[in-house]
Amino acid sequence: MSLSVEAKAKIVADFGRGTNDSGSTEVQVALLTAQINHLQGHFSEHKKDHHSRRGLLRMVSQRRKLLDYLKRKDVARYTSLIARLGLRR
């Protein structure tokens, strides 16, 4: 299930550099995190939904790649983002 348009707009406004900045690394990671958190609730109820689990693993992998890229390019933005999102690193 995807996020609503309002939820995406709020994430873009919170993490983007401008109002229409939907492509920056921070926004992409924040959107993926929101979708991952939504799917985790889905899997607590639907344990055998392996098709969606594959999509979840793909999103987690994509988020990891984006975070690695951001860490390589700008460590300050990386640490700020993981602190704001509450990720472990």
Swiss-Prot record:
UniProt keyword RNA-binding present: yes
Pfam families: Ribosomal_S15 (PF00312)
InterPro entries to which the protein is assigned, alphabetical: Ribosomal_uS15, Ribosomal_uS15_bac-type, uS15_NS1_RNA-bd_sf
Example of a GO cellular component annotation carried by this entry: cytosolic small ribosomal subunit
Record CDD domains: Ribosomal_S15p_S13e (cd00353)
GO process annotations (BP): translation
GO molecular function: rRNA binding; structural constituent of ribosome
Organism of origin: Pectobacterium atrosepticum (strain SCRI 1043 / ATCC BAA-672)
PROSITE patterns per the UniProt record, alphabetical: RIBOSOMAL_S15 (PS00362)
Quaternary context: Part of the 30S ribosomal subunit. Forms a bridge to the 50S subunit in the 70S ribosome, contacting the 23S rRNA.
Protein name per Swiss-Prot or TrEMBL: Small ribosomal subunit protein uS15
SMART domains noted in UniProt: Ribosomal_S15 (SM01387)
Gene name for this UniProt entry: rpsO
Keywords: Ribonucleoprotein, Ribosomal protein, RNA-binding, rRNA-binding
Highest taxon above the source species: Bacteria
Functional summary from the UniProt entry: One of the primary rRNA binding proteins, it binds directly to 16S rRNA where it helps nucleate assembly of the platform of the 30S subunit by binding and bridging several RNA helices of the 16S rRNA.
Lineage of source species: Bacteria, Pseudomonadati, Pseudomonadota, Gammaproteobacteria, Enterobacterales
Family, similarity comment: Belongs to the universal ribosomal protein uS15 family.
